[in-house]
UniProtKB/Swiss-Prot annotation:
Belongs to the bacterial ribosomal protein bL19 family. One of its GO terms (molecular function) is structural constituent of ribosome. This protein is located at the 30S-50S ribosomal subunit interface and may play a role in the structure and function of the aminoacyl-tRNA binding site. GO terms for biological process: translation. It comes from Roseiflexus castenholzii (strain DSM 13941 / HLO8). Keywords: Ribonucleoprotein, Ribosomal protein. This is Large ribosomal subunit protein bL19. It comes from the Bacteria.
Amino acid sequence: MSQQIIEEIERRYMKQDVPEFRVGDTVRVGVRVVEGNRERVQEFEGVVIRKRGSGLNENFTVRRIASHGIGVERTFLVHAPRVESIQVVRRGKVRRARLFYLRGLTGKAARIKERR
């Protein structure tokens, strides 16, 4: 009984327009950022290296290489109100559920094949 109530409340806060994406896909995440009194959307594009959780607690980690070859990782909740949009840029073909090995690779070695 209490589990049904929890699921009903969670369903109310879940987004409906979340695209289907997997680990290895390159995604562009639009995050709402508040700077002083103004608000803007900041894009963060990179490879999904981890997905975990389910329902309202589902989250994913995106890794990209910033300037001067420094790797930047950000973890997002799929249904968070600050996450405005998630776009799949390209689909990757990987055989792992976690791509933490990409942390040790740079340049062409860190490329992921495209899924057809």
